[in-house]
């Protein structure tokens, strides 16, 4: 005899008619057999098969044997849960219909069933405010996904939501053929990196720069954010905006931009104490740079000092220097943007300047300026349009040449400046006494008397009254080994080497956030 039981917990159909003692007739409805399987009988007491039946707000499916299905696919489009009810407006992680009979390890995928119970396929769909993508079989997509030329990131296998904003991601695996070539390139991409996805989920790529939250960032053609030194970042093609180190020794300083460390990445502005560029072969030095819109302030190739050749610098490169105003103060930079300190010859002004250990240009008197393992006193102009320039000639009773105070070693020394001759003591004090006898160390002549016009020598006598030729052996002023500063000086040693300038980077009050200089 068939056992009749009401499906109460899930089903809400009308109650079955009370079972008559003779059981000669039955009303349509649900019944559970001795095995606990539900069936549905129509008004003719026929078992319903291959058909959906609705009970209250829920739909249930009877298979070809009339058994109500549970936790199963129906026609590869619908899914019924453990209670047998059709899934609607909900997610389900399960095997595909075709894999049900031959399950594979980790073969489950997420499916979404809409308001009519059908799985979502081959489309994007907004669900609870988030956008998801599905393949032709209805499986939710995850990870990297390419749709035409657009690239998205859809979270991990249990997420799937279309991402927006910044994400630190691994580049796609080789099997990700849909996006391989768009989001991955072993030549110019790191194994991991920052990517930015717009509000529409599309990855930023194929652009030299992009403004995000008020700051500029650079991306290569594969969408990976570029950081630190960028070679070719100024061009419009993202494919040319490469990470540093791809063109070692062949890059021009004009090619280079700086965009902060990988944790930040935005285009640099202000002062930075950083390692140099590998492409420019300055990566072995840590120097101060000043950036404006990512470009370093630097000397141009017109700022050539005229000092060249293997005797000038260790690598034989030409020396370039420029005095550049930064935030109201003057600093010195070379052609690669490295800030310079100490005594520097600036070709554009054809003069020497001094920049202290923090890079600031100094004016006035500077004592103990190192030169050839010795120290000298310099004086730099403070006004009259020559701010900072080393002075020439007499100043307060002392003789200067390009800022350097000219001195005797022990006694008195004659210097020739232009076509004029001067006599100074070991402190650099100009002499003008016509009665005093001087020991001249230029040629070790003793007891010489001079006549002067102002401080300029106009005549001289030796102790025996004979004329002394003060023009025969005067000292020529020099800084290091430099006696003049025209472009003809290609064989003398550079004063840059001889005065033992050591570039040192000191704390400027620079902060990680602003790169400011105090």
Task: List PLM regions with ranges.
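Extracellular adhesion/carbohydrate-binding repeat motifs centered on closely spaced tryptophans
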Residues: 2-495, 499-502, 506-508, 512-518
């Amino acid at each position: 005899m068939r056992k009749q039981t009401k499906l109460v917990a899930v089903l809400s159909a009308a109650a079955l008619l009370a079972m008559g003692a003779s059981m000669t007739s039955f009303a349509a409805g649900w019944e559970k057999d001795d095995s606990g399987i539900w069936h549905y009988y129509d008004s003719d007491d026929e078992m319903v098969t291959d058909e959906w039946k609705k009970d209250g707000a829920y739909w249930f499916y009877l298979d070809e044997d009339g058994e109500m299905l549970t936790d199963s696919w129906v026609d590869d489009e619908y899914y019924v849960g453990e209670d047998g009810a059709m899934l609607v407006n909900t997610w389900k992680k399960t095997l595909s219909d075709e894999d049900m009979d031959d399950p594979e390890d980790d073969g489950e995928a997420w499916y979404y069933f809409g308001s009519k119970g059908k799985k979502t396929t081959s489309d994007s769909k907004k669900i609870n405010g988030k956008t998801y993508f599905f393949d032709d079989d209805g499986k939710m997509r995850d990870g990297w996904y390419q749709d035409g030329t657009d690239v998205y990131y859809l979270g991990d296998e249990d997420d799937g939501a279309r991402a927006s904003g910044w994400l630190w991601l691994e580049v796609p695996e080789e099997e990700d053929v849909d996006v391989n070539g768009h989001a991955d390139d072993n030549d110019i991409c790191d194994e991991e990196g920052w990517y930015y996805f717009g509000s529409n989920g599309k990855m930023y790529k194929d652009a030299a720069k992009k403004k995000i939250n008020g700051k500029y960032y650079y991306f290569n053609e594969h969408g990976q954010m570029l950081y630190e030194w960028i070679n070719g970042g100024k061009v419009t093609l993202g494919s040319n905006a490469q990470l540093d180190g791809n063109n070692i020794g062949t890059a021009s300083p004009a090619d280079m931009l700086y965009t902060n460390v990988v944790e930040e990445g935005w285009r640099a502005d202000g002062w930075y104490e950083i390692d140099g560029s590998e492409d420019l072969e300055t990566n072995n030095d840590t120097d101060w740079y000043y950036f404006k819109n990512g470009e370093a302030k630097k000397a141009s190739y017109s700022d050539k000092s005229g000092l060249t050749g293997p005797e000038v610098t260790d690598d034989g490169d030409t020396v370039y220097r420029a005095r550049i105003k930064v935030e109201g103060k003057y600093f010195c930079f070379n052609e690669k943007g490295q800030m310079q300190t100490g005594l520097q010859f600036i070709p554009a002004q054809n003069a020497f300047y001094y920049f202290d250990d923090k890079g600031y240009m100094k004016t006035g008197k500077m004592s103990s300026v190192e030169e050839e393992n010795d120290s000298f006193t310099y004086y730099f102009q403070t006004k009259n349009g020559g701010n900072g320039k080393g002075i020439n000639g007499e100043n307060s009773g002392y003789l200067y040449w390009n800022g350097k105070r000219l001195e005797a070693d022990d006694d008195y020394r004659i210097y020739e400046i232009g076509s004029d001759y001067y006599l100074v003591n070991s402190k650099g004090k100009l002499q003008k006494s016509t009665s005093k006898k001087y020991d001249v160390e230029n040629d070790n002549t003793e007891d010489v008397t001079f006549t002067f016009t102002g401080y300029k020598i106009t005549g001289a006598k030796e102790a025996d009254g004979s004329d002394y030729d003060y023009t025969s052996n005067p000292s020529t002023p020099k800084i290091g080994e430099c006696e003049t500063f025209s472009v003809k000086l290609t064989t003398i040693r550079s004063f840059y080497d001889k005065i033992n300038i050591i570039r040192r980077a000191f704390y400027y009050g620079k902060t990680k956030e602003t790169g400011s200089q105090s």
